[in-house]
Amino acid sequence: PVSMPKVELHCHLDGSLSKEFLMQTLQLSTLDMHTIQAPANCQSLAEYLTCFDLPVSALQEKEHIRDAVVDVVRQAAAENVRYMEIRFAPMLSVNSHLDLENVVQSAVYGCQKAFDRYGVFTNLILCAMRHHSPQQNHLVVRCAREFLGNGVCALDLAGDEAGHPNEEFEALFEEA
């Protein structure tokens, strides 16, 4: 029941954005939900992950990242979630005008703003990506360490495990 207080420990930022947020942020007049939903006969994780392309495109500005976190927390608050951990791959938002630290700081600010508005305590889990270079993933590890206890609570490894098995990431795990 909605009235029961809840904890949400596995929430993907890019997979939890509301249709309204995506339409407003991407300035869309319509949104075909099939573009962000995996088909019932999805054949692989790699195919499934293509559903995140559109939501990730909405996370390319500091304000959009902040507002995305607030959007996801708003939805959780409506379900009486009291604590949540939102995971996302910050390197997917790095671009010519947004570095890794600014991406994470924007998400942390979104957590703070959402707490002030909805009273849901939120931490972030930064995801290194299996298809990214070792250098990119080491930067994510360092950033997670920098923000640990200040909005970030953990590090994760995400992506297509079949194409990039765990053995490829031994050095990354040792660093973490």
Predicted regions and their residues:
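Metal-cofactor-binding active-site regions of metalloenzymes
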Residues: 1-176
